Amino acid sequence: MPIVDTGSVAPLSAAEKTKIRSAWAPVYSNYETSGVDILVKFFTSTPAAQEFFPKFKGLTTADQLKKSADVRWHAERIINAVNDAVVSMDDTEKMSMKLRDLSGKHAKSFQVDPQYFKVLAAVIADTVAAGDAGFEKLMSMICILLRSAY
């Protein structure tokens, strides 16, 4: 299932949730390294996205990105937001509330182009559980909610 950022997706099944939790656990247990690796992969594959991060200006190589405290800080925030979604899979109202709030911040305060949510979600899905339809469905749920303020 490709990751989508509009419309809706079917609810996650119990089996999908179990598989997501299993795939996510080792990533989150090493969240600092995992988060930086994901964000570096995102920026090296999609350099135009970096323009929305003024603090990352001038960081042009993967090594520079990995060594940046600002990149590490933002990577941790991304990983924690995904973790909140994983933890909240059984409480979609809670997940929706948190992600809609995050959407508002990205739309109004940071003016991020929402197309990049889907690109980053694909990098996360590929890193965590490449080809797993359930994880891609969760990433779609996240992307749809992150676009809600746009």
From Swiss-Prot:
<dbReference type="GO" id="GO:0019825">
    <property type="term" value="F:oxygen binding"/>
</dbReference>
<dbReference type="InterPro" id="IPR012292">
    <property type="entry name" value="Globin/Proto"/>
</dbReference>
<feature type="binding site" description="distal binding residue">
    <location>
        <position position="74"/>
    </location>
    <ligand>
        <name>heme b</name>
    </ligand>
</feature>
<dbReference type="GO" id="GO:0020037">
    <property type="term" value="F:heme binding"/>
</dbReference>
<dbReference type="GO" id="GO:0016491">
    <property type="term" value="F:oxidoreductase activity"/>
</dbReference>
<feature type="binding site" description="proximal binding residue">
    <location>
        <position position="106"/>
    </location>
    <ligand>
        <name>heme b</name>
    </ligand>
</feature>
<keyword id="KW-0813">Transport</keyword>
<protein>
    <recommendedName>
        <fullName>Globin-2</fullName>
    </recommendedName>
</protein>
<dbReference type="InterPro" id="IPR000971">
    <property type="entry name" value="Globin"/>
</dbReference>
<dbReference type="InterPro" id="IPR009050">
    <property type="entry name" value="Globin-like_sf"/>
</dbReference>
<dbReference type="GO" id="GO:0005506">
    <property type="term" value="F:iron ion binding"/>
</dbReference>
<dbReference type="GO" id="GO:0005344">
    <property type="term" value="F:oxygen carrier activity"/>
</dbReference>
<dbReference type="Pfam" id="PF00042">
    <property type="entry name" value="Globin"/>
</dbReference>
<keyword id="KW-0561">Oxygen transport</keyword>
<feature type="domain" description="Globin">
    <location>
        <begin position="11"/>
        <end position="150"/>
    </location>
</feature>
<keyword id="KW-0349">Heme</keyword>
<dbReference type="InterPro" id="IPR013314">
    <property type="entry name" value="Globin_lamprey/hagfish"/>
</dbReference>
<keyword id="KW-0479">Metal-binding</keyword>
<comment type="similarity">
    <text>Belongs to the globin family.</text>
</comment>
<keyword id="KW-0408">Iron</keyword>
